[in-house]
């Protein structure tokens, strides 16, 4: 279904220089559909690919969910299927010689809080912490 959607789209928007676009071009190559999909693609140098869907220039946009959600008028269909999905992770640590280790610890506690997990979810991100 995923491959059919990509091949069947009039145009797919992706960011040429962004991490999602770099992954996408490699993925369509791996799936054997690059020539069909990229020939009709709308590649943008930077910015939000969802804007190309909102303007009618593309049927689909490829980008991180959090970026797609920020474009008014765009409905996010969902993430890629698990077998072709890639995940970006963000981690935090306190250096042994940190100038303000207590402040850093407080920030990390805030970032790991249930309130932060809710904010991540509201913004299209998924927390990997146990309470999320």
Where are these regions (language model features)?
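Exported/periplasmic ABC-transporter solute-binding proteins
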Residues: 1-132
């Amino acid at each position: 279904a995923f491959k059919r959607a990509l091949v069947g789209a009039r145009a797919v928007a992706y960011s040429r220089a962004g991490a999602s676009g770099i992954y996408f071009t490699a993925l369509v190559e791996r799936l054997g559909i690059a020539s069909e999909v990229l020939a009709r693609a709308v590649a943008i140098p930077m910015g939000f690919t969802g804007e190309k869907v909102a303007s009618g220039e593309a049927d689909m946009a490829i980008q991180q969910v959090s970026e797609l959600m920020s474009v008014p008028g765009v409905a996010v269909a969902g993430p890629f299927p698990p077998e072709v999905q890639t995940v970006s992770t963000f981690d935090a640590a306190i250096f042994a010689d940190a100038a303000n280790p207590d402040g850093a610890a407080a920030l990390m506690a805030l970032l790991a809080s249930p309130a932060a997990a809710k904010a991540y979810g509201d913004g299209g991100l998924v927390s990997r912490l146990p309470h999320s």
